[in-house]
């Protein structure tokens, strides 16, 4: 859990993982908030955080401008409200694309919908730069519900399974939905790729040679063993900064693993 050290075309990336407790009937935690920094609770030592929320965890209204926000929620829920009138709840595998363009005010709160059991949340938020000519375009917004998120299953050379969910770009012949029209990802020459990969134990997965200028990052976010990337052992919650002009072989250890891939030309 925490920020990802990534660079252009990405402005920022954050992985939130919170083991939220049972809800209190009002979408907040059924636990004391004593000792937490009210309105600014980011302590990485805790199992969960309130962030800027005071009763419900999350990020109340705040502005964005000049970039695209990609929010991926594999587990838990997010409630979105914005100044353009869009609102809704998404999660459990859904993805939101939002071009902030000339400016938008929005909030994203993390409702604890279950009062009878814990409410774990996993969320990736990625800020992708907009082309200079598109920075002041009208804000735009698209939901990719989990049933519409392009997905494929493949066998590696040993018959082990690789599951690929493609948010932007194309992997193994699985192509994403159309990006937002003013996105950096709208030009295929920018080689923007965002995908979530689930690897069976002892699986091998290969990333192709694309270009010498492309940035490529792999975050190992969930798993009990290590992942080998060109003989380097990646531990859980570690991020690898890889070459874009090399074929990269990723070899999983002896338990299932989940990785996030981010690619793109600066």
Indicate where each model-derived feature is located.
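Jelly-roll (double-stranded beta-helix
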Residues: 1-266
